[in-house]
Regions:
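Extracytoplasmic ligand/sensor domains, especially the bilobed periplasmic-binding protein
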Residues: 5-104, 165, 176
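Glycine-/small-residue-rich active-site loops that bind phosphorylated ligands and cofactors
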Residues: 81-82, 109, 147
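Short loop/turn motifs at secondary-structure junctions
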Residues: 3-4, 69, 136, 186
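Short hydrophobic segments within beta-strands
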Residues: 75-76, 142-143, 169
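Short, well-ordered amphipathic alpha-helices
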Residues: 87-91, 118-125, 151-155
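Hydrophobic alpha-helical
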Residues: 14-20, 133-158
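Short, well-structured alpha-helical segments in soluble
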Residues: 1-6, 64, 116-135
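Extracellular/periplasmic periplasmic-binding protein-like sensory domains
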Residues: 44, 50, 107, 114-116, ...
Length: 190
């Protein structure tokens, strides 16, 4: 690279970053990599990332809930690959701190099963005509799209659960970016 080039956007692949590092390119130029993670202590000192990794997203929501004093969690995840990968990361992070977790999964495309899944997830029972949740967790991690979240939350309310802090991933942001308005009536704690 010419000496007047002081910033590098990239690389896209980890092996290319390793090659750049072996040639000490990041010592004389700011490197903004398109990678989910960087080697060792490089991040924030000699290189930066353009986007948050899945682990960054998990850490952010857990730090937020810990600041609220929350230590018990539920995970409500679709059975797709993304939902399972994010659930695995979440469980690993939560269990290292000794927190408790209740897990429920649902098929993304089959909304007919969601009512039963929610009943099991929050322990919904009826007291007369009033649904009463018996869930003991304080926050629910839902690694799914905003579109599905808007469908899932009413199922939680139908079971009487309106107390949970709802946590999600960057999929929520992507789902909101194209919308001119959002019905937030059901999402006070999301």
């Amino acid at each position: 690279l010419p000496p007047q080039c002081v910033m590098v956007g990239g690389p896209l692949r980890a092996d290319r970053y390793t090659a750049m590092k072996s040639r000490s390119i990041q010592q004389s130029r700011a490197v903004f990599a398109f990678l989910p993670s960087l080697e060792g202590s490089d991040e924030g000192t000699v290189a930066w990332r353009f986007f948050a990794s899945p682990q960054d997203q998990i850490d952010a929501v857990l730090n937020f809930t810990r600041n609220l004093g929350i230590s018990s969690y539920g995970v409500l995840a679709p059975t797709d690959t993304y939902g399972q990968r994010m659930t695995d990361l979440f469980l690993k992070a939560v269990r290292t701190n000794g927190s408790t977790v209740k897990i429920a999964t649902y098929p993304s495309g089959d909304t007919t099963s969601w009512g039963e899944v929610m009943r099991g997830f929050v322990g919904g029972t009826m007291r007369g005509k009033t649904p009463v949740p018996t869930s003991t967790f304080q926050a629910a991690f839902i690694p799914d799209s905003w579109k599905n979240l808007e469908l899932l939350v009413p199922f939680l309310f139908y079971q009487g659960e309106d107390r949970l802090v709802l946590m999600g991933t960057s999929l929520w942001e992507q789902g909101l970016s194209n919308r001119s308005s959002v019905n937030v009536a059901n999402l006070d704690l999301a």
